[in-house]
Amino acid sequence: MRAHGLRRVLLCLLRLLGVVWTLPNSLMGLLLGICVIPWGARPRLSRSDFALVFDRWPWGPGGAMTLGNVIINTAADLEALCPTYAHRAGLCQEPRVRIGSHERAHVWQYMLLGPFFLPLYFVLGGISVRNPLERAADRYALGQGSWWPWQNSIK
């Protein structure tokens, strides 16, 4: 029982460290979200997605975007289903995924990479099927693997 309690404390501390590490990214997301509240964006905390979510983002083609522990979402909630990047690119047939699960993977990626996430994201291919961060988020949302793109390379 004692080891379980210690493990919970360590996980809590690691999460807190991740939140602090990615705080510059989260502040950008917070500023972005607050700016569009007058146009209909609705903020809420999502414990399951470990993020502050701004639903009903009024602009853009649809979908969601994560900045640190902030998710900007064009839908009414994160339950909306979307195609994976590989499916959209015509590489395979996959079921649609819950957008919140995909974005949660990015939250965890941000918490590990902190201020390096955005530069690395664009170096790895940006918003595309080539980006291993996006492919890992899709696998995670499909329930087929870790949110960490290089999980299999760590042995």
Residue ranges and their predicted role:
Residues M1, N152-K155:
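Low-complexity, intrinsically disordered extramembrane tails and loops of integral membrane proteins
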Residues M1-V9:
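Short, Lys/Arg-rich, polar N-terminal cytosolic tail immediately upstream
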Residues L11-L14, G18, T22, S26, ...:
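A structural signal for well-ordered alpha-helical segments within the folded catalytic domains
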Residues C12, G18-T74, G143-P149:
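Auxiliary, metal-adjacent structural segments of Zn-dependent hydrolase domains
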Residues A64, N73-S101:
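Short pre-active-site segment immediately N-terminal to the catalytic Zn-binding motif
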Residues N69, H106, A137:
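Divalent metal-coordination and catalytic microenvironments
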Residues A86, E94, Q109-R139, W150-S153:
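Post-HEXXH active-site segment of zinc metalloproteases
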Residues I99, E103-M111:
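Catalytic glutamate of the conserved HExxH
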